[in-house]
Amino acid sequence: MPHTLRVAVTQAEPEWLDLAGTVEKTCNLIGEAAENGARLIAFPECWVPGYPGWIWARPVDVELNTKYIYNSLSLGSPEFETIQAAAKRHSIAVVMGFSGRAPSDSLYIAQAIISPDGEVLMHRRKVKPTHAERTVFGDGSGADLSNVVDVDFGGEIGTVKVGALACWEHTQPLLKYHTLSLGAAVHVAMWPPLDPHGGVEHPGLWSMSAEGCQSLSQTYAIESGAYVLHCTAVCTEKGREAMRTHDGLLFHTPGGGHSCVLGPDGRRLTQALHGGDPAKEGVVYADLDLSKVVANRAFLDNVGHYSRPDLLWLGVDRREKGHVVDGERRL
C-alpha cells in the first residue's frame, strides 16, 4: 500500500512586479515547507511576479504591461535555476505558476513542475487565457496538453503522478477530460487572488468568485478522483497600490486567499487559515493517503470503467505549432 504524501499549499502574496523579490520569497517558502515535512509545495497562478490584476480595471496600461514583461520569469534563466536549486537543496517537489517570458518578449500563463532533484519535469502554458488576460498573454499549443508527470519522491512514497491546470482551464470539459486521461493522483488547481461574490446584483460573475472557483476545483476532484490542491494568492493594500486596482472589477479590496486541500471525492480536508481571513498569508498542510485515490476510482473512473468510448471519445492534437515553417520543419 502506498504511504502518505505530505503537501504544502501556499496562500501568500507575491512581491508585486518584482522578479527578484518574488523568487527570493519562493525559495523561503520552499524551505519553510520542507522544514514542516512537506514533500511537495504548490504555488498559485502567475505567482511570479504576481497576477496582473489591473487588466480587470482598465483596458490597457502600457507602463505596467512593460514593467510586467521585464519582471516575468524565463525558463532556463538564473532566477529559474535559483528555484530549481532550492527544490534540490530541500528535496521537495515544486509546482509553480508564473508569467512566462519568451525570447520574443511575449508572455504566457505558465506552469512548471520541478522534481525533488531540481529537474524541470513539466513546463506548459495555459491553453487559452481568460477574457482580459488576452491583453497580456498569448495562447498555448499542442505540447501544453502534456500536463501530468511522474514525480519520484523516493523511499516509501515512490513515484506519484502529479498534474496541474490554471484557473478557468477547470471550466473546459475537453481539456479536463484529456487531463483526466493522464491519471494524476495529485492535481494542483492554480488560481489568482479570489474575491467573495458580491451578491445577486453584483456585476461580477459568480463563476469567477472565491465560491465559484472552489466549486470548480471540487468538481474536478470528483471528476478525476484525485487530490486537488486549490491554491490561491493574497492581495493586500500593497498589491492594490502597485497595480492601481482600487476601482477595478476585481482586486478592489484586500483579500484573495482561500487555499485548501480537497479529497478525491470532492470533500474539503483542511480548514481556512487564520479563521478565514483571506488577507492573511500562510501555508496549508495536509497528509494525503494515496490509497484513497485507488479506492475512489473503484466507484468512479471517467476514463475507464465509467465511460463509453464506443459512443463518445476525444480527439487530440499534441503537436507544437511553430510560428515559422521551413518546408516540413517548424522553426
Curated annotation (Swiss-Prot):
It catalyses: a nitrile + 2 H2O = a carboxylate + NH4(+); 4-chlorophenylacetonitrile + 2 H2O = 4-chlorophenylacetate + NH4(+). The keyword Disulfide bond does not apply. InterPro entries: C-N_Hydrolase (IPR003010), C-N_Hydrolase_sf (IPR036526), Nitrilase/CN_hydratase_CS (IPR000132), Nitrilases_CHs (IPR044149). The active site is at 45 (proton acceptor), 126, 167 (nucleophile). GO terms for molecular function: arylacetonitrilase activity; hydro-lyase activity. Its EC number is 3.5.5.1, 3.5.5.5. It is an enzyme of class 3 (hydrolase). Keywords: Hydrolase. Residues 5-290 form the CN hydrolase domain. Belongs to the carbon-nitrogen hydrolase superfamily. Nitrilase family. PANTHER family: ARYLACETONITRILASE, NITRILASE. Nitrilase that hydrolyzes preferentially phenylacetonitrile and (R,S)-mandelonitrile. Also acts on dinitriles like phenylenediacetonitriles (PDAs) 1,2-PDA, 1,3-PDA, and 1,4-PDA, and cyanophenyl acetonitriles (CPAs) 2-CPA and 4-CPA. This is Arylacetonitrilase. It comes from Auricularia subglabra (strain TFB-10046 / SS5) (White-rot fungus). The gene is nit.
